[in-house]
A protein has these predicted regions:
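Intrinsically disordered, low-complexity, mixed-charge
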Residues: 1-189, 193, 197-200
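A contiguous, well-structured pocket-lining segment that forms one wall/lid of small-molecule binding clefts
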Residues: 189, 196-198, 469-483, 487-515, ...
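Conserved phosphate-binding catalytic cores of ATP/NTP-utilizing and phosphoryl-transfer enzymes
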Residues: 274-279, 354, 375-384, 428-436, ...
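Internal gly/pro-rich beta-alpha loop/helix module
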Residues: 359-434, 670, 674-675
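Active-site histidine-anchored catalytic micro-motif
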Residues: 566-634, 639, 643, 667, ...
Length: 774
């Protein structure tokens, strides 16, 4: 940047640096303080609503060294996105100081809030050192670790803006906080046993039965005895049982109403993880990282079976039936039934470290909620919500501002893929291209969707609130400028919220919107939502738009997937976008999910789609893949299906009366919507192969179909064909806005299904059939 002022005749110069990025809550101010002191520079630093602001005075060559070393030696958890420099006339600072954080009427707060960080090695030494004053203290932290996003109420990141504001530091903690060479220098959650939060153990009625270290010891005894403990952690409660105790795990499943979905397991250390799972170097690095996510690891099976028995639930059995035991590296099959992967994490808070040190065996640590509800964060609320699940509650008095689940990550092709973005990742911004729409016609810049209402000729700056879909919900906010739409290179993405299917989830959805909006003083002037009229997020967007006269942009579900990839990888048109999904509202009145979009400079065209097939029962077919298999075969055979005498397991799972009802529904097109969904195609194939007729969680059938491959590799595959004419006449027009949605080509899956049936009749191995299909 060109200097605003630079006196060549002066030896002393003043340099002002404005730094944006991840620079609050990572020890950045102490780092700058120590660097300035080492270089004998004077001036100051403070947190601002946009990052940090620094002014330093000294010799020109020393100031240049100061700039260079900031970039080279910055704290490990920090990230500098922008560094703006202005030269100013010196004012004669006499010392370097950390000033009180700025609280001005800045037009927009854009400072990056750091996620919660796993306990660092230095703090671990503290809590396991009998001579240390923080010995066995479960809320030990420093500038390199501990709570951040879960406790912050407002920017800038200072103690008085966090839930630690009510805990006054003792003299020892205050000395650490004030000493520039201490690693707790300006560590906002700094605390100790004298002045900080404390543990209590409650019975299921909320009565205190132990406190402090005794609470932790009794909690360990509770887990050893096979009972269920609810533990208040960083971003909410965990439900915990001994992972080796199949009776205890099954009891947790029944109480939590989670009969088959995999449960995460927390191990005391990496050595024990490696006894049960294969761990690559990259996976080990992830497990031990500051984010400390759940990592999906390949399990070690001592006894390999080519065709293992399926749990009764996957065959459509009753929920109170037990899962068959599976011999493997230590854990029973009930933690992750018929699944070659295990969701594994390591202790990431002092509470978890201290508890696991006492137990020295793996524990199930699943979200503290009923299935499909948001995680519980408040100790008063938990006694009401979870007292039918947990036998005891290990709680503390440090408030949690917002629920944050554990993140889930899987390594695919030696690259990290985040499957659930929450603790350790949120709310770090997602990088965006420098601009969206540059060098493109104005109509394309502002109409990035299929339909819109309201005036989109917004005065800059643009502030977008994007509300996501219905399942696995998240929201995002972005700041930008018109012509072209530029977003400061980032959008702030919330933590995983969950499925918007009950009042608690809807309340959590609104609270996340309010929370992010309050932190960033964010008032949107454009609302973006899914095009599905029945989604809660869409209805919320419409109400918000009407109340505040915000324009609203509705984006077709699968087109949103394509746009997300375009933005993530900064891809220029023309391009082909392929979106294969479970369910999405189609503009032709059908359910989309296997779509091919041609994206050019001026138009978006749905050029191809999977051949449609009926879903008997609509949404009910999602939980009963056997209905999908029936719809696939009916599309091919019509009523001959019911007279064919096919000896297929999925047909036998229906009672005769049920089959008659299904036939009537299909013939009369009663509650049998058409779909092009690839996700539903996978579900139907799983049922055709007898792998899975009913599921208790979304995606269960497709997972089981993938796992049936059992590491088999083959060059064989099933053929498919393309249809070059529209499958069905459409009632609506060919185009909406700048998008054509009437597909010309259809991928015909008929040969695939016929090939699968032929292989099944010829008794080919299930793993081969699944591998050929994939």
């Amino acid at each position: 940047m060109s200097p605003d002022y630079f006196d060549l005749n002066s030896q002393q110069h003043r340099l002002q640096l404005t730094i944006q990025g991840t620079v609050q809550g990572v020890g950045f101010r102490p780092f700058i303080y120590r660097l300035a002191m080492e270089l004998n520079l004077t001036g100051w630093i403070n947190n601002s609503v946009s990052g940090v602001l620094i002014e330093v005075e000294g010799l020109w060559e020393v100031l240049e060294q100061f700039k260079y070393r900031i970039l080279q030696e910055k704290p490990p958890q920090s990230e500098i996105q922008t560094l703006d420099i202005v030269w100013l006339p010196p004012v004669g600072y006499s010392e370097f100081e950390i000033r009180v954080s700025e609280s001005t009427n800045h037009p927009q707060k854009i400072a990056i809030i750091l996620p919660d960080l796993s306990t660092c090695s230095d703090c671990l030494q503290d809590i396991f050192d009998p001579e240390n004053r923080r010995y066995q203290y479960p809320f030990t932290n420093c500038t390199n670790c501990g709570p951040r996003y879960s406790i912050i109420r407002d920017l800038p990141y200072d103690r008085n803006h966090t839930t630690m504001a009510t805990f006054t530091m003792c003299s020892d903690c205050q000395n650490e906080y004030s000493h520039p060479l201490n690693r707790r220098f300006h560590a906002q959650p700094n605390a100790c046993p004298v002045c900080g939060p404390q543990l209590e153990l409650w019975d299921k009625n909320g009565k205190v039965i132990a406190s402090l270290n005794q609470a932790l010891k009794q909690a360990a005894d509770i887990i050893r005895s096979g009972q269920i403990l609810a533990l208040k952690g960083l971003g909410g409660f965990h439900l915990i049982v001994d992972a080796r105790n199949e009776t205890a795990v099954q009891n947790l499943r029944q109480r939590k109403r989670r009969p088959a979905k995999p449960l995460a397991v927390m191990y005391p250390n990496l050595e024990q993880v490696k006894q049960d799972c294969l761990v690559s170097e990259l996976e080990e690095k992830l497990l031990s990282s500051p984010a400390a996510p759940i990592v999906l690891l390949r399990r070690i099976f001592n006894q390999l079976k080519s065709d293992p028995p399926h749990p009764p639930l996957l065959r459509g059995g009753e929920e109170n039936q037990t899962f068959p035991p599976i011999t493997k590296g230590g854990l029973g099959g009930v933690t992750s039934p018929e699944n070659p992967y295990l969701g594994v994490m390591l202790p990431y808070t002092p509470i978890h470290h201290l508890l696991l040190a006492q137990l020295n065996f793996p524990i199930v640590a699943t979200s503290g909620n009923f299935a499909n509800e948001p995680i519980c964060i408040d100790e008063a609320e938990v006694v009401t919500r979870l007292n039918t699940i947990a036998d005891f509650f290990l709680v503390h008095n440090r408030p949690i501002v917002r629920p944050i689940d554990d993140s889930i990550v899987r390594i695919i092709a030696n690259q990290e893929m985040v499957l659930r973005r929450a603790r350790g990742y949120a709310p770090l911004p997602i990088s965006l291209p420098d601009s969206i729409g540059a060098n493109r016609p104005p109509s394309y810049q502002t109409n990035l969707s299929l339909s819109q209402s309201g005036d989109l000729s917004i005065e800059k700056p643009i502030k977008i609130l994007a509300l996501g879909g219905h399942l696995k919900s998240t929201i995002a906010i972005a700041f930008g400028w018109a012509e072209p739409i530029a977003f400061n290179q980032k959008a702030f993405l919330s933590q995983h919220i969950g499925d918007l299917e009950n009042p608690l989830a809807l309340a959590a959805f609104q609270e996340v919107i309010n929370s992010l909006s309050n932190i960033y003083d964010f008032q949107p002037n454009i609302i973006v939502c899914d095009d599905h009229p029945d989604y809660y997020s869409t209805q919320f967007a419409e109400n918000l738009s009407q109340q505040n006269q915000y324009p609203i942009v509705r984006v077709q579900h699968h087109l949103a997937h394509v746009f997300a990839v375009i933005a993530e990888h900064n891809l220029p048109p023309p391009l082909l976008g392929i979106a294969w999904d479970g369910t999405g509202y189609g503009l032709d009145g059908t359910i989309w999910g296997g779509e091919f979009f041609q994206v050019t400079e001026t138009i978006i065209q749905r050029i191809a789609s999977f051949r449609r097939f009926p879903l008997p029962g609509g949404d009910k077919a999602v939980s009963e893949p056997r209905r999908i298999a029936l719809g696939l075969l009916y599309e091919l055979l019509g009523n001959d299906l019911f007279n064919s005498g096919m000896n297929l397991e999925f047909m036998e799972s229906f009672k005769p009366q049920e089959l008659r009802i299904m036939q009537t529904m299909l013939n009369r097109k009663l509650n049998t919507p058409l779909t092009s969904s690839v996700g539903r195609l996978f579900d139907g194939v799983a049922a055709l192969l007898g792998i899975c007729q009913r599921v208790s969680f979304e995606g269960g059938a497709a997972m089981a179909l993938e796992f049936a491959i059992d590491n088999l590799e083959t060059d064989e595959y099933y053929l498919f064909a393309w249809l070059d004419t529209p499958q069905l006449p459409l009632e609506k027009g060919d185009n909406i806005g700048n998008m054509s949605y009437n597909s010309r080509y259809y991928l015909n899956w008929e040969l695939i299904i016929k090939g699968i049936l032929e292989d099944k009749i010829n008794e080919k191995p299930i793993n081969l059939i699944s591998a050929k299909f994939h």
